[in-house]
Swiss-Prot record:
Family the UniProt entry places it in: Belongs to the UPF0337 (CsbD) family.
Taxonomic source organism: Bradyrhizobium diazoefficiens (strain JCM 10833 / BCRC 13528 / IAM 13628 / NBRC 14792 / USDA 110)
Protein name, UniProt field: UPF0337 protein blr1496
InterPro entries: CsbD, UPF0337_stress_rsp, YjbJ_sf
Signal peptide boundaries: none
One family name in Pfam for this protein: CsbD
Domain of life: Bacteria
Gene3D superfamilies: YjbJ
Amino acid sequence: MDKDRIVGSAKEFAGRAEGAVGDLAGDAQTQASGKAREAAGTVQNLYGQAKDAVREASETAAGYAKDAYDNSGETFRDGSQAIARKVQDNPLGALLVAGGIGFALALLMSRPARRPPPRWRYYG
């Protein structure tokens, strides 16, 4: 539990009590002050709740990232072994795929730069 939540709850309670005293005494200023303190306490309590939620979400995300990092070596190794098996099973297909990828990359890299369209100006 966050400090802001505790302080906010205390302010909210104090504001309710002050508002009740203002109601009993018939003092509008005390009643308004109590309502203002209650509202401030509610806002601070909500702020503390939001901070707690963000903290929990960041801890969860960090845990997921750590798990993904820990398992990345195994995943890479398994993928490499699967590709090696496919290449051994069908070497001609692997050669054609590699050639196609190389050809596509060569086309992308050797493409001429686009020129801007000519501007036609009328001088008259």
